[in-house]
Amino acid sequence: MASAHIEHKLSLLPDLPGSYQMKDINGKIIYVGKAKNLKNRVRSYFKSSHDGKVAAMVSQVADFDFIVTSTDKEAFLLEITLIQKYQPYYNIKLKKGTGYPYIKITHERDPKIEITGTIRKDGGYYFGPYPNVYAAQETMHFIQKVYPLRRCNGYQGRPCLYYHMGQCLGACFRTVPEKEYTDQIERIKRFLNGNVGKAKASLTAKMERAAKNLQFERAAEIRDQLHYIEQTVEKQKIISHDNTTRDLFNFYMDKGWISIQVFFIRQARLMKRESRLFPVVNTAKEEFESFILQFYSRKNNVKPREVLVPAALDNKVLADILEIPVRTPQRGEKRDLMALAAKNSQIKLEDKFRLMELDNRTTIGAMKELMAALNLPMGHVAEAFDHSHIQGADPVSAMVQFVDGQPAKNNYRKYKLDADKTHNGADEAANTREVIRRRYTRLLKERAPLPDLILMDGGEIEMNAAKDVLENELNLDIPVAGMVKNNKHKTAALLFGNADQLINLDPKSQGFYLLERIQDEVHRFAITFHRQLHAKNSLASRLEGIKGVGPKTRLKLLRKFKTINKIKEAPLEDIQELGISKKVAQALKLSLTAEPTPARRV
């Protein structure tokens, strides 16, 4: 079953072609795919049953991302590029090998056309990469027939077979003029860059002629050849035909937010994409220019040979600061890429707004469910409390606040309990009375708003202790419920009412999910605070009995090392740097070697 986060993102997928990237819980890309329709393809992973490797992959997906393209063919080539870049685990298993073909015109006196899997700086012309080896080969064979160069091994004193077939210019028996090669190479370059109109028209005429003459096999061959050419040669916006390293920036702004896309073009391919979203303080132009400059001020950031930006920016100023050319594409492939980045920026920001709206509906709905389960009117603010101590030592309490189902972390509070003075730190009822008294006495004194619901981690002891203070000491009427856990220490139900009624929520409901979040969050907050306090107090108490370590020295040690283990592991020289003599430093390390067995934390 997909998580709520993934369900929300699935509902926002566009009906457009593109590449999608599946990520695990650590944000690592584990699978890259392509789709003619992103919505249908990505949803199919989570809405259908699978087995084998697909099921294994889906079980690890914690998030996904996508890049919209103009055509499904661009999605195919982008998928190739991303697989080569990230080497995702499941792609490597499902698609062995990462070599994809290029069509190459060699740099020789008598050049030839060939298929290669490697780009070298040898002066040759490279076109690709292409997704289909067979299609690339068929296109190359077509070029050899229509735009022949050299197909033989060179001069041999007599015409080769390919010359007689019209597929070689004759380097096998004569000196071919360089201009003849140059003109032919220009025709091939135009063809491979997408200018295939004349060639396709010629093939179509041949196919129709063959069909008219009942040469159906020949007509079918030509039809397949046309298909291969369309599949392989059609110009791609994602792929650039030169090797200049470029970074392309574009943005979209709406409702006080700016969405920025950065396309990294390396080795003639889109190698990486970064997305950024943040609220706008200045104008979009100022924010965007500031982002670009900060982008290259990051540590270890390597600048490209060229930066591409949309119109209306101060290109000269940016170029002067970055010390590299900053240009705005006016036509062709680069302008199309710029438009694609703008489109992805808009989709990213619109997705954020929709997710915010969905999250808002979900969390408000969850709070409404929680209040309804307790037969209470709709409320907005819930405060939850939990205690932590080790067999009564270093007792603390923590309070977290949720507003409309969302954590309000600025309103979280931590309390060191006065257990040594007033009660046993292991007394859960006394701990509850103290923290409830302190929290709501303070709110009354400050005339601050009171919560609509108080949740106590635990059971009837904590719940009734809280109610006792609120009703009998502070004269407050705030509903209090206990968050009950099962024997696996997981959220199970609520305890509420004068009769300590057990109220079960639907485990699949948003209300139950919110209750789990609140209980986990307050427990985490309390435990973290207790660990910090206990470590500090344990270190201080261990240091008190060591001869030569007075209050000032203890303070220095606490500030520098913070834990006993760090002092034990520290070289004597580090301890002596605090102004401690070698003799005292040695006594200190010796005294700390015997650690007491830690007691259970609750």
Swiss-Prot record:
GO terms for biological process: nucleotide-excision repair; SOS response. Residues 197-232 form the UVR domain. GO terms for molecular function: DNA binding; excinuclease ABC activity. InterPro entries: GIY-YIG_endonuc, GIY-YIG_endonuc_sf, GIY-YIG_UvrC_Cho, RuvA_2-like, UVR_dom, UVR_dom_sf, UvrABC_protein_C, UvrC. SUPFAM superfamilies: C-terminal UvrC-binding domain of UvrB (SSF46600), GIY-YIG endonuclease (SSF82771), RuvA domain 2-like (SSF47781). Residues 15-92 form the GIY-YIG domain. It is found in: Cytoplasm. Pfam families: GIY-YIG (PF01541), HHH_5 (PF14520), UVR (PF02151), UvrC_RNaseH (PF22920), UvrC_RNaseH_dom (PF08459). The keyword Cytoplasm applies. GO terms for cellular component: cytoplasm; excinuclease repair complex. Coiled coil: none annotated. Keywords: Cytoplasm, DNA damage, DNA excision, DNA repair, Excision nuclease, SOS response. It comes from the Bacteria. The keyword DNA damage applies. The UvrABC repair system catalyzes the recognition and processing of DNA lesions. UvrC both incises the 5' and 3' sides of the lesion. The N-terminal half is responsible for the 3' incision and the C-terminal half is responsible for the 5' incision. Interacts with UvrB in an incision complex. Belongs to the UvrC family. This is UvrABC system protein C. The gene is uvrC.
